[in-house]
Curated annotation (Swiss-Prot):
Disulfide bonds: none
Keywords: Sporulation
Entry protein name: Stage III sporulation protein AB
Pfam families with a match to the protein in the record: Spore_III_AB
NCBIfam families: spore_III_AB
Species classification: Bacteria, Bacillati, Bacillota, Bacilli, Bacillales
GO biological process, one term: sporulation resulting in formation of a cellular spore
KW Heme (keyword) present: no
Key word Coiled coil present: no
InterPro entries recorded: Spore_III_AB
Length: 171
């Protein structure tokens, strides 16, 4: 009876580990979609609402789920504190929040390049830079969805199978 209970515990623990490891593949496309929605909202606020950047960032942060909302909240806070420029505020916010995101280096570079253009162009040029970032994020989203389809189920299965292997080795 005790061996059976231990075996069940091992399978549950390794399966849970597999699901947690697979969560990265689930979170990345979701966070990229949120970033795209945020940039589209930012574009609308800049182009049609004529909203200041810090106010638009606050509003966007309220609309998004964690951890992506934290990026825009931190950006708004940096701007409110009187950061040197929007570029500096964006970079500091991105560095602060980056470890909580499930994104790759390529998405970091897209967001960093986008931040370099924030607040230094007129509205039309800013809109073009937002659309460029959206295009890059769209390609990253397709890549993330492909990686999710390819790897998520395998990692979940490996967690379960690792538990079964461990049980067989211990018996």
């Amino acid at each position: 009876m005790l061996k059976l209970l231990g075996a069940v515990f091992i399978v549950v623990a390794t399966t849970w580990t597999g699901f947690e490891m697979a969560k990265i593949y689930t979170e990345r496309p979701r966070q990229i979609r949120q970033l795209r929605a945020a940039l589209q909202s930012l574009e609308a606020e800049i182009m049609y609402g004529h909203t200041p950047l810090h106010t638009a960032s606050q509003q966007i942060a309220k609309q998004l789920a964690q951890p992506v909302s934290t990026l825009f909240s931190a950006f708004s806070d940096q701007l409110d504190k009187g950061s040197d420029s929007a570029k500096t505020a964006w970079e500091q916010s991105l560095k602060k929040v980056w470890d909580t995101l499930s994104l790759k280096k390529s998405e970091y570079e897209v967001l960093k390049q986008f931040g370099e253009t924030l607040g230094i162009h007129d509205r039309i040029s800013q809109q073009k830079h937002i659309k460029l970032a959206l295009t890059h994020l769209e390609a990253s989203e397709a890549d993330a969805e492909q990686a999710q389809a390819k790897n998520e189920k395998m990692i979940k299965s490996l967690g379960f199978l690792a538990g079964l292997l461990l049980i067989l080795l211990l018996m």
